[in-house]
């Protein structure tokens, strides 16, 4: 908490500026949902359940999951791995949904979509976000 207080207390910190900018410019319901999902679901209750499951199963249960819904990408960034793998590697909607559902049972509510370019599958990701609206 000391680090968080230090960052939030410094008005010149870029992270503090971004947080305040988000509160000023985003719809209040969006901010509320993100704070609840990240702070409560992922942070408080989720982390507690993750710790319990680490002890119960005797293995590392992560707090966050990085998922690559697709290797497809329309950006062609220099040095990026996605161009080497082509556009055909995709997790199905059922596989993505199953990963999130099973992760939530372990206490994981924080997901980072990587890839390729995840927004190539924007419709699918939005469907997952609506179904799993307690995740960040």
Language model segments and positions:
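Conserved alpha-helical substructure of the radical SAM core
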Residues: 1-135
């Amino acid at each position: 908490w000391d680090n968080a207080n230090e960052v939030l207390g410094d008005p010149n910190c870029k992270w503090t500026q971004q947080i305040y900018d988000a509160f000023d410019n985003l719809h209040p319901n969006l901010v509320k949902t993100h704070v609840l999902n990240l702070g409560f679901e992922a942070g408080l209750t989720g982390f507690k359940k993750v710790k319990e499951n680490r002890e119960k199963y005797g293995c590392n249960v992560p707090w966050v999951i990085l998922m690559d819904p697709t290797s497809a990408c329309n950006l062609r960034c220099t040095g990026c791995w996605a161009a080497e793998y082509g556009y055909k590697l995709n997790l199905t909607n059922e596989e993505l949904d199953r990963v999130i559902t099973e992760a939530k049972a372990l206490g994981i509510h924080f997901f980072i979509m990587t890839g390729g370019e995840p927004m190539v599958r924007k419709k699918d990701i939005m469907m997952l976000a609506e179904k799993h609206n307690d995740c960040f």
